[in-house]
Every structure is written in structure tokens, then in C-alpha cells.
Amino acid sequence: MHEGHQESFKELEMTKPYMFFNELVGEEDYNKELENSNTKFQGQGQLKLLLGELYFLNTLIKNKTLCSDTVIVYIGSAPGSHINFLYHYMDDLKIDLKWILIDGRDHDRSLESLKNVSIIHRFVDEQYLFKLRNMIRKNHKIVLISDIRSLRGKEPTSEDLLHDYALQNQMVSILKPIASSLKWRCPFPDQWIRDFYIPCGDEFLQPFAPPFSAEMRLLSCYSRAPIRLIRIDKNAAIEYEKKMFYLNTKIRPKIVLDFDYPNQKYDYFYMFYILKDIVLPTYKEFSTYKQKVIFLQEAIFNALNIKP
């Protein structure tokens, strides 16, 4: 059991957070009237991305998948201010990566002077993916990160999402990455258009996502198994909606009991669980997980100009 709580309480007893969608067992019918909070703090979006990408890249480090002949291809990377932290984190670990950042929007200026970072100012289509594949040396392994989103900059329609997922499938098929982190939010059942396919992967739940976000990251490693696609139908969409609404209304707003940390809110508990196992250079040693996570949180919040 992950947690034990009563409906009326605003506290949880948990030994670990829900990290992946398949761990969610509770369901809650969607209720638009409950979606009354859109409060976000400055830098929250970049924090969400940074924590998810730290987890993803650390998984590859521990699996000995990530090494110095690797190119990180990040499509939809702007503004990307969090990438500066990732870059210096990898540099501290002496992992000499190459980065290709691609977006038609403007990137944070702090990225322009970084060594081995190429910034390409354009949006991606199938034709450009073939060109990109030919640009990258054949002996370089590709790790793909995608954060593509609607050109309108608003909540995407189901048609927008289907277009994005078809494009992400092309990214995986053409670039042939050894691993990928893809943006993933199932279209809502009441806006359903048609069934579609996505790559198999672990559906990573994002700490510090907006309060009622149903977005996840689809994490896949292809070095041990070929790419497989799974079909998503309307029944799956109903399950996604109910379980993500349960997570966002019954779990994330609460505090975690017996969690010895300055902030006991669920998203901080989740962040703690990710950061406590992050690989660090050998010269950075801590006597407790709490010391380690406080150190990392301060570094991350300072990098993103977040006021705790």
C-alpha cells in the first residue's frame, strides 16, 4: 500500500510517492467545478521539466546507457532555462555530452555560450527529422527528449495532440534513439476523435505539474528491446481521466505525515524521493538524504530563480 488516509483529512501516510501511472489504483470521476485552482509559482514549469529529466537521465547513467558519445536531441526545448542546470550537472559528473536544442521559439540566452550546445531555431517536421539524422555522426548515440506543444500556446485540442503524437512516433522511428522521454497526455474522453498509437514506455507522473494537469512523460529505453507501439482507445482515455483526477484531487493537495523535511507537501515529498537517489560527484558527500536533498533543492531553486 502506498498510502492510508481518510477522505476528510488533508494528510497522507506514505512510504513512497506514486511515480508511474500504473501504480495508481484510486479513481475519481472528473468534476469541472473542482478545477478552481490554477495557481502556479514562477519557475514551476521549468522545475517540473528539470526534475523529470534529472530522473530520466539518472536512470540512463545507472544503466550505463549515457556516456560521452551521446547526443541529447531536445525537440521543443525553449525557453529551456532549466537545461543550464542539467548541462552543468552532467559536466560535474565528467559526462561530456553534445546537446542539440530545437524550437521555433526563443531560447534562454544563458544557453548560447555553452560548449557543445547547438541551438536550432525552427519547428520540426518529418522532412527535417531525416535531415537531422544525417547531421548526427553515425557513431553517436541519440537520447531524445520531446516537449513539443501547440503553436497556439493554449490548451491543445485533441487534434493538436494526435498531430503531436504522430510526430513523436516519427521522431523515434527516424532518429532511432537509444532512449526517449516523450510528452504524453491522453485526449479527454469527451473530446475523443479516434484511436491512435504511442511507443511502449513507463508513464512517469510529474512533480510540480499544474494542479489539474493530466500530463505525464513517456520514458522508454530501446537498447534492450525494439520499439513497440501500443493502441490507445476511448476506454483507456476514461481510465486516464479518472486516475489522474484522483491523483490531482485526493493526493497532490495534501501533506505527508512523518516526512522530515522543511516542506511536507506531496510534491516536495515526490521531489525528495527523486533527488535522494541522484548520482553526484564523489567529492559531494552527505551524511543524510535530508542534507543531500536540501542542498540539491537550494541549487535547483537558485538556478531557476524560485523563491521557496
Curated annotation (Swiss-Prot):
Disulphide-bridged cysteine pairs: none
Positions annotated as active site in the UniProt record: K183
Catalytic reactions on record: a 5'-end (N(7)-methyl 5'-triphosphoguanosine)-ribonucleoside in mRNA + S-adenosyl-L-methionine = a 5'-end (N(7)-methyl 5'-triphosphoguanosine)-(2'-O-methyl-ribonucleoside) in mRNA + S-adenosyl-L-homocysteine + H(+)
Keywords of the record: Elongation factor, Methyltransferase, mRNA capping, mRNA processing, Protein biosynthesis, S-adenosyl-L-methionine, Transcription, Transferase, Virion
Main location: virion
Any single Gene Ontology cellular-component annotation: virion component
GO terms under biological process: 7-methylguanosine mRNA capping; methylation; regulation of mRNA 3'-end processing
InterPro entries linked to this entry: mRNA_MeTrfase-like, Pox/kineto_cap_MeTfrase, Poxvir_cap_MeTfrase, SAM-dependent_MTases_sf
Residues annotated to bind mRNA: Y30, R185, C186, P187, F188, D190, S213, A214, E215, E241
GO-annotated molecular function: mRNA (nucleoside-2'-O-)-methyltransferase activity
Cell location: Virion
Biological role stated in the UniProt entry: Displays methyltransferase, positive regulation of the poly(A) polymerase and transcription elongation activities. Involved in the modification of both mRNA ends and in intermediate and late gene positive transcription elongation. At the mRNAs 5' end, methylates the ribose 2' OH group of the first transcribed nucleotide, thereby producing a 2'-O-methylpurine cap. At the 3' end, functions as a processivity factor which stimulates the activity of the viral poly(A) polymerase OPG063 that creates mRNA's poly(A) tail.
Family designation: Belongs to the class I-like SAM-binding methyltransferase superfamily. Poxvirus/kinetoplastid 2'-O-MTase family.
Protein name according to UniProt: Cap-specific mRNA (nucleoside-2'-O-)-methyltransferase
Species assigned in the record: Fowlpox virus (strain NVSL) (FPV)
